[in-house]
Design a protein with these regions (language model features):
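Glycine-/charge-enriched secondary-structure boundary and capping motifs
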Residues: 141, 145-156, 233-237, 242-309
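Short, positively charged interaction helices/loops
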Residues: 18, 40-60
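Conserved mixed alpha/beta catalytic, RNA-binding, or beta-rich assembly cores of soluble enzyme
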Residues: 94, 107-109, 175-180, 190-233, ...
Length: 309
């Protein structure tokens, strides 16, 4: 048996001595048992307790696409989830087609990309912002909008946000892209959980362009908080943000993704084929008996738009 010398803080030594006295053991015996138990835990309990030693070869990583996200499944039991979005001709510049301030644009860039990643059950770790505009003032305004939106789900943008701007040439139209990288345990991914007889519900109404501004003010569109609320409910099975292809297209992908058919239901006044712009609608497949619970949870327009067959 080898002897190992280690330095420990006084507080830890006080705890060790207290335990030694309580159980009539020597200090070294307490340390030996503590280390033995810890090593046993690392060896046998869950992937999240193991130190991550990524000695991973590319051939060991499986790549899949799920809607607007890419998923890299690692042999460690973890999954890296990436989502991205882009915008052009929307912003405060001279030749932008939709005139909004930079903060508003940043908010919705963050909302779209974060929704896609969070909907899978992954936790966002990194946001990478690439801007085709100057840093000051437009870039700073867009960045501030992203930071505010990130804070709504508990992220610290000063730690997770990377930025790159175009400062070599003057720009007259706004262009921006945002990529979000998240991490999850593979067995906790919220993918392919939809079940036969599930209802497909739409939270929010599809809005695009200038419609989004008024709809946001009137509480008619889905937001990040709603996705987080859905993630916390066991009666919610799969979640998907709707983009430019519309509600019907996204709902069909949810059904086909689990090898099922979709019975489409078109509520009066809701266009299932209209673009939902910057993820103004979120779809969820739910236990049919919990529809009233969902409506009580989220005070937004909620419509049943389909049933999984």
């Amino acid at each position: 048996m080898d002897i190992i010398n280690v330095r420990l803080p006084d507080k830890v030594l006080e705890d060790v001595d207290r335990l030694a006295k309580k159980h009539s053991l020597t200090r070294s015996e307490v340390m030996r048992q503590a280390l033995t138990i810890y090593l046993h835990l690392i060896e046998n309990v869950g992937t999240m307790l193991r130190p991550i030693a990524f000695q991973v070869k590319p051939a060991q990583i499986s790549y899949t696409r799920h809607g607007d996200v890419s998923i890299l499944k690692m042999p460690t039991g973890h999954a890296i989830v990436t989502g991205s979005t882009s915008s052009g001709a929307v912003g405060p510049k001279e030749f932008d087609k939709v005139k909004v301030d930079g903060k508003f644009l940043g908010k919705f860039l963050a909302r779209v990309a974060l929704m896609d990643v969070i909907a899978t059950g992954a936790f966002p770790l990194l946001l990478s912002l690439t801007l085709g505009v100057e840093n000051d003032p437009t870039g700073k305004e867009i960045s501030e909008g992203i930071k505010r939106e990130a804070r709504t789900i508990g992220l610290d943008p000063n730690q997770v946000l990377m930025e790159n701007t175009e400062d070599n040439f003057p720009t007259v139209q706004t262009g921006a892209g945002l990529t979000v990288v998240g991490l999850a345990n593979e067995d906790e991914l919220r993918l392919g959980k939809t079940m036969p007889n599930d209802l497909v519900v739409a939270i929010g109404r599809p809005k695009v362009g200038m419609e989004v501004i008024a709809a946001e003010a009137h509480g008619e569109i889905a937001d990040l908080k709603n996705v987080a609320q859905l993630n916390q409910r066991k009666y919610v099975h799969d979640i998907a943000a709707v983009g430019s292809f519309g509600i019907a297209s996204e709902a069909k992908m949810m059904a086909y993704g689990v090898g099922r058919q979709l019975k489409l239901i078109e509520p009066k006044g809701l266009d299932l084929n209209k673009s939902a712009g910057p993820a103004t609608v979120v779809l969820a497949t739910i236990d049919p008996e919990r529809l009233d619970d969902l409506k009580a949870l989220i005070p937004k327009p909620i419509n049943v738009i389909g049933e999984i067959l």
